[in-house]
UniProtKB/Swiss-Prot annotation:
Protein name according to UniProt: Transmembrane protein 254
Organism (species): Rattus norvegicus (Rat)
InterPro entries assigned to the protein according to its UniProt record, in alphabetical order: TMEM254 (IPR028110)
GO CC term (a single one): membrane
Segments traversing the membrane: 15-35, 63-83, 95-115
Bilayer disposition of the protein: Multi-pass membrane protein
UniProt keyword annotations, A-Z: Membrane, Transmembrane, Transmembrane helix
Pfam families: TMEM254 (PF14934)
Signal peptide location: none
Principal subcellular localization: membrane
Compartmental location: Membrane
Amino acid sequence: MGTATGASYFQRGSLFWFTVIAVSFSYYTWVVFWPQSIPYQSLGPLGPFTKYLVDHYHTLLRNGYWLAWLVHVGESLYALVLCRRKGITDSQAQLLWFLQTFLFGVASLSILFAYRPKHQKHN
């Protein structure tokens, strides 16, 4: 989606970072919920490290997983606050910011932080 300005401003984030985040979070989900199906021996150095974490810290991994999603919810809600502060009042743009930030966290939120709306002169 292209970027608009003012009340309907939205900018999609970097495809590179979104891919890195999606692959990482997918792997994390796999580790937490289906660790018995992971081919540890085929993952190079990541395999034994992941196996060690699963064997010794699975509860911590699971709690960290849910904490990560909770943080993403908080970031998404903060994105809505930032939208209002920056004059982004279009409900579709706000929804896009909320969803993008929920899925990709600070990779999305940093774009919204950097946005500087043009202020109109008041005479």
